[in-house]
Amino acid sequence: MRWKDEGVIIAVKKYGDKNLILSLFTKNHGKCRGLTRLTNNSNYKFQISNLLHAEWSAKLPENLGFLKCELIESPFHHFFQDRLKSIAIVSFSSILEKVLPESESCIKLYDNFRHFIDVIKHNSQFWQSHYLNLELLLLTQLGFKLDLSKCAVTGVKENLQFISPKTGRAVSKKVGDCYADKLLPFPQMLHDVYNNNLQNSYSYQEFRLGLKITGYFLNKYLFLQLNAKFPELRNFMLSFES
Protein backbone atom coordinates (compact mmCIF):
# COMPACT_ATOMS: atom_id res chain seq x y z
CA MET A 1 0.00 0.00 0.00
CA ARG A 2 1.28 3.46 -0.88
CA TRP A 3 0.02 7.03 -0.83
CA LYS A 4 1.33 10.59 -1.12
CA ASP A 5 0.06 13.58 0.82
CA GLU A 6 1.10 16.76 2.60
CA GLY A 7 1.24 16.83 6.37
CA VAL A 8 2.37 18.65 9.50
CA ILE A 9 4.70 16.95 11.98
CA ILE A 10 2.92 16.55 15.34
CA ALA A 11 5.33 14.16 17.09
CA VAL A 12 8.87 12.89 16.67
CA LYS A 13 10.38 9.89 18.45
CA LYS A 14 13.88 8.53 18.05
CA TYR A 15 14.07 4.87 17.01
CA GLY A 16 17.55 3.45 17.27
CA ASP A 17 20.57 5.49 16.22
CA LYS A 18 19.59 6.36 12.68
CA ASN A 19 15.79 6.32 12.51
CA LEU A 20 12.82 8.34 13.68
CA ILE A 21 9.17 7.51 14.09
CA LEU A 22 7.23 10.48 12.76
CA SER A 23 3.62 11.23 13.48
CA LEU A 24 2.02 13.42 10.82
CA PHE A 25 -1.34 15.11 10.60
CA THR A 26 -1.99 14.85 6.87
CA LYS A 27 -4.57 16.60 4.75
CA ASN A 28 -6.27 13.57 3.22
CA HIS A 29 -5.19 10.64 5.38
CA GLY A 30 -5.54 12.10 8.87
CA LYS A 31 -3.00 11.07 11.49
CA CYS A 32 -0.37 8.60 10.37
CA ARG A 33 2.90 7.26 11.70
CA GLY A 34 5.92 6.04 9.83
CA LEU A 35 9.59 5.21 10.11
CA THR A 36 12.05 7.54 8.42
CA ARG A 37 15.82 7.56 8.22
CA LEU A 38 17.78 10.24 10.06
CA THR A 39 20.81 11.68 8.26
CA ASN A 40 23.37 14.26 9.28
CA ASN A 41 21.61 16.94 7.24
CA SER A 42 18.00 16.12 8.08
CA ASN A 43 17.64 17.21 11.72
CA TYR A 44 16.18 20.58 10.72
CA LYS A 45 13.53 18.83 8.62
CA PHE A 46 11.92 16.92 11.47
CA GLN A 47 10.64 19.59 13.84
CA ILE A 48 7.09 19.81 15.16
CA SER A 49 4.99 22.18 12.97
CA ASN A 50 7.08 21.56 9.83
CA LEU A 51 5.08 21.00 6.65
CA LEU A 52 6.19 18.05 4.52
CA HIS A 53 5.48 16.26 1.29
CA ALA A 54 5.16 12.67 2.51
CA GLU A 55 5.12 9.32 0.75
CA TRP A 56 3.93 6.50 3.04
CA SER A 57 4.30 2.83 2.16
CA ALA A 58 3.63 -0.47 3.92
CA LYS A 59 2.60 -4.02 3.09
CA LEU A 60 -0.64 -3.64 5.07
CA PRO A 61 -2.62 -0.52 6.13
CA GLU A 62 -2.27 -1.42 9.81
CA ASN A 63 1.54 -1.62 9.62
CA LEU A 64 3.76 1.20 10.87
CA GLY A 65 5.04 1.80 7.37
CA PHE A 66 7.89 3.89 5.98
CA LEU A 67 7.91 7.61 5.23
CA LYS A 68 9.86 9.46 2.56
CA CYS A 69 9.66 13.16 3.31
CA GLU A 70 10.50 16.41 1.56
CA LEU A 71 10.37 19.67 3.48
CA ILE A 72 7.88 22.23 2.17
CA GLU A 73 8.10 24.79 4.94
CA SER A 74 9.67 25.16 8.38
CA PRO A 75 7.82 27.90 10.32
CA PHE A 76 9.72 27.22 13.56
CA HIS A 77 12.06 30.22 13.29
CA HIS A 78 9.05 32.56 13.17
CA PHE A 79 7.97 31.75 16.71
CA PHE A 80 10.72 29.90 18.59
CA GLN A 81 11.68 33.04 20.56
CA ASP A 82 8.10 33.47 21.80
CA ARG A 83 7.72 30.87 24.52
CA LEU A 84 3.92 30.93 24.77
CA LYS A 85 3.42 30.58 21.01
CA SER A 86 5.91 27.72 20.90
CA ILE A 87 4.14 25.99 23.78
CA ALA A 88 0.75 26.49 22.10
CA ILE A 89 1.84 24.80 18.86
CA VAL A 90 3.59 21.91 20.60
CA SER A 91 0.67 21.55 23.03
CA PHE A 92 -1.97 21.30 20.31
CA SER A 93 0.25 18.93 18.34
CA SER A 94 0.50 16.66 21.38
CA ILE A 95 -3.29 16.77 21.79
CA LEU A 96 -3.73 15.73 18.16
CA GLU A 97 -1.21 12.92 18.61
CA LYS A 98 -3.15 11.57 21.59
CA VAL A 99 -6.76 11.85 20.46
CA LEU A 100 -6.97 11.69 16.67
CA PRO A 101 -7.92 8.29 15.27
CA GLU A 102 -5.46 6.72 12.86
CA SER A 103 -5.91 7.24 9.12
CA GLU A 104 -9.23 9.13 9.30
CA SER A 105 -9.38 12.28 7.22
CA CYS A 106 -10.22 15.52 9.08
CA ILE A 107 -9.71 18.05 6.31
CA LYS A 108 -11.47 20.96 8.03
CA LEU A 109 -9.40 20.51 11.18
CA TYR A 110 -6.23 20.12 9.12
CA ASP A 111 -6.91 23.33 7.18
CA ASN A 112 -7.61 25.23 10.39
CA PHE A 113 -4.43 23.88 11.99
CA ARG A 114 -2.42 25.02 8.96
CA HIS A 115 -4.12 28.41 9.16
CA PHE A 116 -3.30 28.68 12.87
CA ILE A 117 0.38 28.07 12.13
CA ASP A 118 0.23 30.80 9.47
CA VAL A 119 -1.40 33.17 11.97
CA ILE A 120 1.44 32.49 14.41
CA LYS A 121 4.02 32.83 11.65
CA HIS A 122 2.74 36.26 10.65
CA ASN A 123 2.75 37.43 14.27
CA SER A 124 -0.97 38.16 14.41
CA GLN A 125 -2.21 39.68 17.67
CA PHE A 126 -5.30 37.47 17.37
CA TRP A 127 -3.51 34.12 17.53
CA GLN A 128 -4.99 33.23 20.94
CA SER A 129 -8.53 33.38 19.54
CA HIS A 130 -7.46 31.08 16.71
CA TYR A 131 -6.04 28.65 19.26
CA LEU A 132 -9.31 28.43 21.20
CA ASN A 133 -11.13 28.02 17.90
CA LEU A 134 -8.91 25.01 17.12
CA GLU A 135 -9.78 23.31 20.41
CA LEU A 136 -13.51 23.93 19.90
CA LEU A 137 -13.24 22.56 16.36
CA LEU A 138 -11.38 19.48 17.57
CA LEU A 139 -14.21 18.71 19.99
CA THR A 140 -16.73 19.18 17.19
CA GLN A 141 -14.83 17.03 14.68
CA LEU A 142 -14.63 14.16 17.17
CA GLY A 143 -18.35 14.31 17.97
CA PHE A 144 -18.47 16.48 21.09
CA LYS A 145 -19.63 19.87 19.87
CA LEU A 146 -20.41 22.37 22.62
CA ASP A 147 -23.72 24.23 22.20
CA LEU A 148 -23.00 27.77 23.33
CA SER A 149 -25.51 29.49 21.06
CA LYS A 150 -28.45 29.76 23.49
CA CYS A 151 -29.52 29.00 27.02
CA ALA A 152 -30.12 25.27 27.49
CA VAL A 153 -33.11 25.98 29.76
CA THR A 154 -34.94 28.96 28.24
CA GLY A 155 -33.54 29.17 24.71
CA VAL A 156 -32.64 32.87 25.06
CA LYS A 157 -29.49 34.04 23.29
CA GLU A 158 -28.67 37.05 25.48
CA ASN A 159 -26.72 37.28 28.75
CA LEU A 160 -25.18 33.84 28.43
CA GLN A 161 -22.77 33.77 31.35
CA PHE A 162 -22.39 30.11 32.31
CA ILE A 163 -21.72 26.68 30.80
CA SER A 164 -23.03 23.41 32.18
CA PRO A 165 -20.08 21.09 32.94
CA LYS A 166 -22.38 18.10 32.39
CA THR A 167 -23.82 18.97 28.99
CA GLY A 168 -21.47 21.55 27.48
CA ARG A 169 -24.42 23.89 26.88
CA ALA A 170 -24.73 27.58 27.69
CA VAL A 171 -26.85 28.90 30.56
CA SER A 172 -28.16 32.45 30.92
CA LYS A 173 -27.35 34.67 33.88
CA LYS A 174 -30.96 34.67 35.05
CA VAL A 175 -31.12 30.89 35.18
CA GLY A 176 -27.56 30.24 36.29
CA ASP A 177 -27.10 32.74 39.11
CA CYS A 178 -28.70 30.37 41.62
CA TYR A 179 -26.38 27.54 40.54
CA ALA A 180 -23.22 29.52 39.86
CA ASP A 181 -21.09 27.31 42.12
CA LYS A 182 -22.01 24.26 40.01
CA LEU A 183 -21.51 25.88 36.61
CA LEU A 184 -18.51 26.98 34.58
CA PRO A 185 -18.10 30.65 33.64
CA PHE A 186 -18.62 31.61 30.00
CA PRO A 187 -15.89 34.19 29.24
CA GLN A 188 -16.50 36.83 26.59
CA MET A 189 -13.50 35.69 24.56
CA LEU A 190 -14.87 32.17 24.24
CA HIS A 191 -18.30 33.58 23.35
CA ASP A 192 -16.75 35.59 20.51
CA VAL A 193 -14.64 32.68 19.27
CA TYR A 194 -17.66 30.36 19.28
CA ASN A 195 -19.45 32.91 17.09
CA ASN A 196 -16.45 33.02 14.74
CA ASN A 197 -15.35 36.51 15.76
CA LEU A 198 -11.59 36.02 15.86
CA GLN A 199 -10.48 39.63 15.39
CA ASN A 200 -10.74 41.00 18.94
CA SER A 201 -7.87 41.44 21.37
CA TYR A 202 -8.08 40.14 24.93
CA SER A 203 -5.94 40.00 28.02
CA TYR A 204 -3.97 36.87 28.81
CA GLN A 205 -6.25 36.39 31.82
CA GLU A 206 -9.26 36.20 29.50
CA PHE A 207 -7.41 33.74 27.27
CA ARG A 208 -6.63 31.63 30.32
CA LEU A 209 -10.33 31.50 31.25
CA GLY A 210 -11.09 30.22 27.76
CA LEU A 211 -8.33 27.63 28.04
CA LYS A 212 -9.80 26.35 31.30
CA ILE A 213 -13.17 25.78 29.66
CA THR A 214 -11.94 24.06 26.49
CA GLY A 215 -9.41 22.10 28.53
CA TYR A 216 -12.13 20.86 30.86
CA PHE A 217 -14.15 19.42 27.96
CA LEU A 218 -11.11 18.06 26.11
CA ASN A 219 -10.19 16.15 29.23
CA LYS A 220 -13.75 15.01 29.97
CA TYR A 221 -14.78 13.91 26.49
CA LEU A 222 -11.46 12.77 25.01
CA PHE A 223 -8.60 12.09 27.41
CA LEU A 224 -10.59 10.45 30.19
CA GLN A 225 -12.43 8.31 27.64
CA LEU A 226 -9.10 7.18 26.20
CA ASN A 227 -7.60 6.71 29.67
CA ALA A 228 -4.84 9.09 28.57
CA LYS A 229 -2.99 11.74 30.53
CA PHE A 230 -3.77 15.36 29.70
CA PRO A 231 -0.62 16.97 28.20
CA GLU A 232 1.58 18.75 30.72
CA LEU A 233 2.38 21.52 28.25
CA ARG A 234 -1.32 22.25 27.86
CA ASN A 235 -1.61 22.59 31.65
CA PHE A 236 1.47 24.81 31.64
CA MET A 237 -0.32 27.30 29.39
CA LEU A 238 -2.62 28.05 32.34
CA SER A 239 0.25 28.98 34.63
CA PHE A 240 2.31 30.85 32.06
CA GLU A 241 3.20 34.38 33.14
CA SER A 242 2.63 36.74 30.24
Swiss-Prot record:
Domain of life: Bacteria
Cellular component, GO annotation: bacterial nucleoid
Keywords: DNA damage, DNA recombination, DNA repair
Alphabetical list of InterPro entries matching this protein: ARFGAP/RecO, DNA_rep/recomb_RecO_N, NA-bd_OB-fold, RecO, RecO_C
One Pfam assignment: RecO_N
One GO term of the biological process aspect: DNA recombination
Function: Involved in DNA repair and RecF pathway recombination.
Family in the record: Belongs to the RecO family.
Protein name: DNA repair protein RecO
Species this chain originates from: Wolbachia pipientis subsp. Culex pipiens (strain wPip)
Organismal lineage: Bacteria, Pseudomonadati, Pseudomonadota, Alphaproteobacteria, Rickettsiales
